A protein has these predicted regions:
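Nucleic-acid endonuclease domains
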Residues: 1-150
């Protein structure tokens, strides 16, 4: 529905695609395809990834930019047709060497009081958000002097 609104109502360009040919999905799932695309980069530092992927940025969203380039996407991967249809929300996480997460992640706000008053968990607003949603957590672990490794 979002794609229809963006394309025909708002006149926005088409969403970028990760999978260039539908034939790819005959052999593997979308999730397996994503893992196959990014596993070649496991163990690389942010600087190595920036060099290899041609990224010249130190933006706060650097990890998201690196992930998009790993998947051959220009722009946000959350806006790709495949991620939208699959209901997958990508989240990049930086974990410090002491095991603590560097930044907090944003999630929709919800009312704890209202949640506690729901008859069942399945009727809650939070459940209706979490149940159909998949999260793709991409971890960058700090190793050494501020170097984050994928």
């Amino acid at each position: 529905m979002t794609q229809i609104l963006n394309k025909y109502i708002f006149g926005n360009a088409e969403s970028p695609c990760i999978i260039k040919s539908a034939d790819v999905l005959h052999a593997k799932t979308f999730e397996d395809y994503i893992i196959d695309k990014v596993k070649h980069y496991y163990g690389m530092t942010q600087n190595e990834l920036k060099f290899r992927l041609g990224v010249d940025s130190n933006a706060k969203s650097l990890n998201e930019i690196l992930l998009a380039r790993m998947l051959d996407v220009k722009g946000r991967i959350a806006c790709t047709e495949e991620f939208q249809k699959a209901g997958i929300i990508p989240k990049t996480i930086r974990v410090q060497s002491n095991g603590k997460i560097k930044e907090s992640m944003s999630f929709p706000t919800f009312d704890f009081i209202a949640l506690s008053k729901e008859e069942t968990w399945e009727e809650s607003e939070l459940y209706n958000y979490l149940a159909p949603t998949k999260f793709m957590f991409v971890i960058f672990q700090e190793r050494g002097a501020g170097a984050y490794v994928f």
